[in-house]
Structure formats: structure tokens, C-alpha cells
Amino acid sequence: PPPQQYIALYEYDAMQPDELTFKENDVINLIKKVDADWWQGELVRTKQIGMLPSNYVQQI
């Protein structure tokens, strides 16, 4: 199945090496919901994979 895609509602600057930095309106493919607050995703624009705060994105 195609990946679930999310759009970034806000800009986020990574605070840890395993986190994604992204801009508002970036598209992110969901890889895994690690827990309620942190998900793993792939930033479509750069193909970078990392953790992101779930409250910064909304499903497309």
C-alpha cells in the first residue's frame, strides 16, 4: 500500500541527531508511529528519514 502522507503544519528544527528538520507545508511519508508523540517519517523533499513530533503534522 502507498505510504500515509502528512503535511507539516509548522516548521520544526531538529534538537537531536535522529530527528527531522522540516518546513511548514513539507510532505512527510509516515514510516512508523513509535508512540503517541513521536513518529518516524521520510521527508519527501530531501528523502531524509528521522523522528518527528506528531502534533506538528496532519494527514493529507
Feature locations, PLM:
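Src homology 3 (SH3)-mediated interaction modules
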Residues: 1-60
